[in-house]
Amino acid sequence: MGTSSFSVINPEQTSSSGGCFLVFKDEFLDLLGPEPEIEVILENKNYPFAHEAGVLILATNEVWITSNQYLVEGKKHIQISKIKREGSKFACEEVNPDGVPYANGAVNYKDGVLFCAQGTPTSPGGLVYMEPRPPYRTEVVLNNYLGRSFNSVNDVVVHSDGSIWFTDPVYGFEQKIRPRPMLPSVVYRFDTASGDLRVMADGFGKPNGISFSPDEKTVYVTDTAAQHGGGEFDSARAATMYVAPTTHFPFLRKSI
């Protein structure tokens, strides 16, 4: 198992003007500066509005976010919103595009946002592209693997070669928003040029976050199997980040 040293910055500060930062590489200290601060710019006490995504669209100067699940008239709901800076203040606007059921992670794609749509008990999820301006038209990019519906697509990243990499755990089933899984929990790569969709890595409990290194030679995938969709936590299961070189295409050789 790999190990890494880290530094803790501002461990005692808990106010909105201070923050605690775990620094695994000294280069990050240059980004933080001598007196790093965390500032609360928006807050919503009615529901957990800022849970996933966090996609900045430079053309509109807006950040797109997705909420965690909450109840609306007794039914589970996830809200898509966009944050825009107005002078020294920030405003949040709820947006309800068609065709993005239970949105979760997202990434910049083309001129807009590529959402992970987890799906519903009766409709499949997948990857859905949304234009960033009204009327927020959407287009399904993927919604199945070899004819079988995805479990509940969770997070996504786009490589500079145009390929789309994403994770597909079973959280939707455990949270009772998706039917019983038809596929294992794996990492996929979709070649947008050829249409080829393949499994890049398996053996995960619940593959979750995914990201590339700046040079794109490495991909990082978190496995959050310890956190059950029903809220229970099992410390005997994986709470791990895996790393794999992308140079071993078409498959990944992951390590901790």
Segments the model singles out, each with a brief description of its role:
Residues 1-256:
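Sequence-structural signature of mature extracellular/luminal beta-sheet repeat domains
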